[in-house]
Amino acid sequence: MIRTMLQGKLHRVKVTQADLHYEGSCAIDQDFLDASGILENEAIDIWNVTNGKRFSTYAIAAERGSRIISVNGAAAHCAEVGDIVIIASFVTMSDEEARTWRPKVAYFEGDNEMKRTAKAIPVQVA
């Protein structure tokens, strides 16, 4: 059996740019890519917390330390500057590998300040 698992996630980053006329993609600060394990040119899903839209594109690197999250091309219709989004990538693996897999998650606040990283998502409690 093959399973699709969360590979990496940027939780609650703020969109800093939205460029309808750029070729496409989502530019992400290289530090953020490193923290989440997301690679340049990797397929990503973006879930807009602000407006509820969900869309797919691919990641490109933005300048390290810039805190840039730039949604580009047609995807710019799905996000505006200031929107809070979650960016995720996924990986496929065997059922056996999935049993011990841990994603790389980076948590953000304010103006894209990385507050912490984790190898698991906390258990939701009542």
From Swiss-Prot:
It is an enzyme of class 4 (lyase). Substrate binds at T57, G73, A74, A75. Cleavage and activation of PanD is accelerated by PanM. It is found in: Cytoplasm. Its cofactor is pyruvate. Is synthesized initially as an inactive proenzyme, which is activated by self-cleavage at a specific serine bond to produce a beta-subunit with a hydroxyl group at its C-terminus and an alpha-subunit with a pyruvoyl group at its N-terminus. Its EC number is 4.1.1.11. Pathway: Cofactor biosynthesis; (R)-pantothenate biosynthesis; beta-alanine from L-aspartate: step 1/1. Gene3D superfamilies: 2.40.40.20. The active site is at S25 (schiff-base intermediate with substrate), Y58 (proton donor). Keywords: Autocatalytic cleavage, Cytoplasm, Decarboxylase, Lyase, Pantothenate biosynthesis, Pyruvate, Schiff base, Zymogen. It comes from the Bacteria. InterPro entries: Asp_de-COase-like_dom_sf, Asp_decarbox. GO terms for biological process: alanine biosynthetic process; pantothenate biosynthetic process. It catalyses: L-aspartate + H(+) = beta-alanine + CO2. Binds 1 pyruvoyl group covalently per subunit. GO terms for cellular component: cytosol. The modification Pyruvic acid (Ser) is found at S25. GO terms for molecular function: aspartate 1-decarboxylase activity. Belongs to the PanD family. Heterooctamer of four alpha and four beta subunits. Interacts with PanM. Catalyzes the pyruvoyl-dependent decarboxylation of aspartate to produce beta-alanine. This is Aspartate 1-decarboxylase. The gene is panD.
